[in-house]
Design a protein with these regions (language model features):
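The substrate-binding groove and active-site-proximal loops of carbohydrate-active enzymes
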Residues: 43-56, 88-101, 130-141, 164-175
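Aromatic-lined substrate-binding rim segments of carbohydrate-active enzymes
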Residues: 56-68, 72-127, 176
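Ser/Thr-rich, Pro/Gly/Ala-heavy low-complexity intrinsically disordered linkers and tails
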Residues: 13-18
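Active-site groove signature of glycoside hydrolases
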Residues: 125-131, 146-175
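C-terminal motif of bacterial Sec signal peptides marking the signal peptidase cleavage site
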Residues: 5-6
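Short, well-ordered coil/turn segments that N-cap beta-strands
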Residues: 33-38, 70-72, 116-120, 156-161
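Boundary/entry segment of secreted carbohydrate-active catalytic domains
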Residues: 19-72, 77
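An active-site-proximal structural segment forming one wall of the substrate-binding cleft
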Residues: 100-116, 135-162
Length: 176
């Protein structure tokens, strides 16, 4: 990290040595004793994430790196968004206009979470329409079907610990 020091313009031209200051002069005593990061999100397929370029080798390296830095929990931020889904979920393929995914990322993520002894939480599907249109029950019903399907297909994984509710509400959300 670079620390900006107040130096005269003349001294600043010579760099830190001219100021007689270094980053160490400003470091806090507990710099390496912050609250550890133990969990992270996995962004599955959507929006602006170039996930399609990663295969199991890249994901394995990522999970290994996460484990090595102390992460013990991964959360699939959502099962899909709009037309993009993280696995071939039959309930979504039958009822929504979604693309058939080329890879079962959920199986891959759970297998890697098992391998590295991590807890895995599954995020819900975001249709990109029902929630925004105020059709909350439709989004909920869709996800209830998804939960049943996901548990039947993936519930045997030791790492599978539960669910993450990705839909958000605020004080501005009407008719909730």
């Amino acid at each position: 990290a670079v620390v900006l020091a107040a130096c005269s313009p003349k001294g600043a031209a010579g760099g830190d040595a001219a100021c007689g200051l270094s980053d160490d002069d400003f470091r806090t005593e507990g710099i390496l004793q912050a609250i550890p990061v133990r969990a992270t999100f996995l962004d599955e397929v959507s929006w602006d994430i170039p996930h399609q370029n990663w295969g199991v080798r890249e994901w394995d390296a990522d999970f290994r790196a996460m484990k090595n830095m102390g992460i013990n929990t991964v959360v699939l931020i959502r099962a899909g968004l709009g037309r993009w889904i993280a696995a071939p979920f039959e309930c979504l393929l039958e009822s929504e206009e979604v693309y058939y995914p080329p890879v079962d990322l959920v199986e891959m993520f759970l297998t890697l979470a098992d391998k590295y002894g991590m807890a895995f939480y599954f995020g819900m599907y975001d249709s990109g329409k029902y929630w925004q249109e105020g059709l909350f029950q439709r989004e909920i019903d869709l996800n209830l079907k998804l939960i049943d399907e996901v548990w039947a297909r993936y519930g045997h994984h030791e790492s599978f610990q539960g669910w993450y509710l990705s839909q958000e509400i605020s004080r501005r959300t009407k008719n909730m």
